[in-house]
């Protein structure tokens, strides 16, 4: 009986983990959803990086500050072959009215589409609905999807704290740079900083590391400039 109870609990925990959303380095969930710029599918973004992000509700102050920040970095994201796509469980008409309000009150134009996820299909698929926060509103979730449709990063913020768009931009730059240079990025890496050289995979490679011309502290820790 004790074994059965533990097994049942473990299964419940596993089900909770696996059913709450996508996983890193796996294909991002497909979607086909109405937006402020017509219907959009994940396949529409094939060949580009995509930042898909949710917010709790239109016409709310924290969300407004986030959208203004995303809008101000829109051109920088575009230059990085990256599209922005917002989402909330509000109507298409609410999104449009809010976009116009932001332009009128703050002088900022929102030039990226927003999904009107009234049936919560996309939000559920991406684990944007967190029952501990709300059953009817998405939390502040951010997903970075690469040009092959693979989920490369995801970040969740609570309802009462706005996300850092600068950090999302930094993370995107780090992912793209790591892919292009076959390296890893240290804590708080920024363009111009040295990068981490992959750790040797064999004893022979570890022994040879010191003579390879990197900035080597020990066999497992080497950096280099790009």
Name what the model sees in each region.
Residues 1-12:
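Short, Lys/Arg-enriched N-terminal segments with co-localized hydrophobic residues
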Residues 13-226:
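Chalcogenol-based redox active-site neighborhoods
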């Amino acid at each position: 009986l004790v074994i059965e109870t533990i097994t049942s609990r473990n299964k419940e925990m596993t089900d909770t983990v696996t059913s709450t959303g996508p996983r890193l380095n796996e294909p991002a969930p497909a979607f086909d959803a109405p937006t402020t710029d017509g219907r959009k599918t994940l396949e529409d973004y094939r060949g580009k990086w995509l930042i898909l992000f949710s917010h709790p509700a239109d016409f709310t102050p924290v969300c407004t500050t986030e959208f203004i920040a995303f809008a101000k970095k829109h051109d920088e994201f575009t230059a990085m072959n990256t599209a922005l796509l917002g989402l909330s469980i509000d109507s298409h008409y609410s999104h449009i009215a809010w976009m116009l309000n932001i332009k009128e009150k703050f002088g900022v134009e929102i030039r990226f589409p927003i999904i009107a996820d009234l049936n919560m299909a996309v939000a559920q698929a991406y684990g944007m609905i967190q029952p501990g926060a709300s059953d009817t509103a998405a939390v502040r979730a951010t997903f970075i999807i690469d040009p092959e449709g693979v989920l490369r990063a995801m970040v969740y913020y609570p309802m009462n704290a706005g996300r850092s768009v600068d950090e999302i931009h930094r993370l995107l730059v780090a992912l793209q740079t790591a892919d292009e240079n076959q390296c890893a990025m240290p804590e708080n890496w920024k363009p111009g900083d040295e990068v981490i050289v992959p750790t040797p995979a064999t004893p022979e490679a570890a022994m040879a590391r010191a003579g390879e011309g990197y900035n080597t502290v020990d066999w497992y820790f080497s950096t280099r400039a790009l």
